[in-house]
């Protein structure tokens, strides 16, 4: 018995010694292999995020700023601007949005008007499917309404299947007294900053955030590709919680667009770090919009901006146009009576995958690498090669986004 007790005590001492030695080994290995942990970047405080669906329903004027309801269940709605922002019309901030409901699908919101507290509605991808990419959707509607059904809500499940997070933008409209070129474009750029600021919370890669606009919504996504520096300089007050967060989109989608900044030969400066663009439109059947699409493409091509791709389809019309059988051309994801124009979204996915946006979060994209390589080349007019890059200008922003100024995404 005494021998057994002695053996047991010796075994316990041996196990304790082994555990202690292993702990020392792990600590020593970690100290040798890694650098001391780097402190997380400090940013101004952001307001807490609301819970999904914990929002008031549309109703009469309130005694507080109106907050819109989600278009789809589970969406997190976040106002773009803090209360009291000088960019808001405070005398109208309490007015409720007006939702036009679908006649075919009960409970579906087809379009929205009376937007005075612009917002984003965030739909994230769960688990290992999440690529960290995020697409902000700017619906069309001629600046008189916001067609969030076909040109926003329908894309949430589509992009989810590819691991892409979807953000629905509710921007201010001309019919409600706002300027599309100023207020609506500001809303788009502010949305990019807001998503980038909350990248960690939403498990979004801050280097994979872009905007896709449809028709009038493309009048937001196309200028966002060249005006981000100006917006960031204008909105850099120390009291702004988003000050220092870049509004540069990492990519833009320009879908059957309205007039772009290059309409009728206009030549505004193009930053040399302008983002990649995917452009699509019907051709002769939507001639004016196709010309606007081509003007953007030609300007970026002449400036030498990498990875600008355009698809013009021979058969098709603009959404809402009357067809020969009396029906109307549909928008968004619909197959458009099975014509090739009805599959443009798969060409976008091909382009998106090729540029590396469907990789896991934290991996540098091909798009980012090629922009960096482009920036290393001599700018036009430097006398060191290059040339033909009309309008391309040096940009003071980070070459490929604002990762150093935003939180690193958490692992999904």
Question: Predicted segment positions?
Answer:
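Conserved alpha/beta-hydrolase "acid-adjacent" motif
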Residues: 286-295
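Short beta-strand/loop motif that positions the catalytic acidic residue
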Residues: 279-281
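Catalytic nucleophile-loop/oxyanion-hole region of alpha/beta-hydrolase
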Residues: 147-148, 154-155, 169-203, 337-340
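Short beta-strand element of the alpha/beta-hydrolase
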Residues: 131-140
């Amino acid at each position: 018995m005494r021998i057994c007790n002695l053996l047991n005590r010796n075994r316990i001492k041996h196990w304790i010694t082994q555990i202690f030695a292993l702990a020392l080994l792990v600590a020593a290995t970690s100290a040798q292999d890694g650098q001391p942990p780097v402190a997380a970047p400090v940013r101004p405080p952001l307001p807490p995020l609301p819970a999904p669906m914990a929002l008031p329903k549309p109703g009469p004027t309130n005694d507080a700023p109106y907050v819109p309801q989600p278009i789809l269940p589970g969406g997190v709605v976040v106002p773009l601007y803090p209360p009291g922002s000088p960019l808001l019309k405070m005398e109208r901030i309490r007015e409720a949005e007006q939702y036009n409901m679908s006649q075919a699908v009960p409970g579906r919101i087809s379009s929205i008007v009376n937007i005075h507290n612009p917002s984003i509605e965030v739909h994230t991808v769960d688990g290992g499917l999440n690529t960290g990419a995020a697409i902000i959707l700017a619906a069309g509607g001629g600046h008189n309404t916001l067609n969030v059904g076909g040109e926003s809500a329908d894309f949430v499940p589509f992009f989810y299947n590819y691991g892409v997070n979807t953000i629905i933008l509710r921007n201010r409209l001309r019919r409600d007294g706002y300027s599309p070129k100023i207020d609506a474009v500001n809303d788009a750029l502010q949305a990019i900053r807001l998503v980038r600021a909350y990248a960690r919370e939403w498990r979004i890669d801050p280097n994979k955030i872009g905007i896709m606009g449809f028709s009038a919504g493309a009048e937001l996504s196309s200028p966002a590709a060249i005006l981000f520096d100006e917006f960031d300089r204008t909105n850099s007050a120390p009291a702004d919680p988003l000050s220092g967060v870049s509004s540069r989109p990492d990519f833009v989608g320009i879908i059957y667009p309205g007039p772009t900044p290059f309409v009728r030969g206009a030549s505004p400066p193009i930053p040399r770090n302008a983002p990649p663009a995917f452009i699509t439109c019907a051709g002769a059947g939507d001639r004016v919009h196709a010309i606007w699409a081509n003007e953007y493409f030609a300007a970026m091509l002449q400036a030498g901006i990498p990875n600008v791709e355009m698809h013009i389809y021979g058969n098709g019309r603009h959404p809402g146009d009357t067809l020969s059988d009396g029906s109307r051309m549909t928008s968004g994801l619909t197959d458009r009576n099975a014509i090739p124009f009805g599959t443009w979204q798969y060409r976008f996915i091909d382009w998106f995958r090729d540029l590396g946006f469907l990789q896991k979060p934290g991996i540098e994209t091909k798009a980012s690498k090629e922009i960096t390589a482009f920036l290393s080349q001599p700018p036009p007019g430097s006398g060191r090669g290059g040339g033909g890059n009309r309008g391309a200008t040096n940009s003071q922003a980070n070459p490929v986004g604002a990762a150093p100024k935003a939180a690193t995404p958490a692992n999904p």
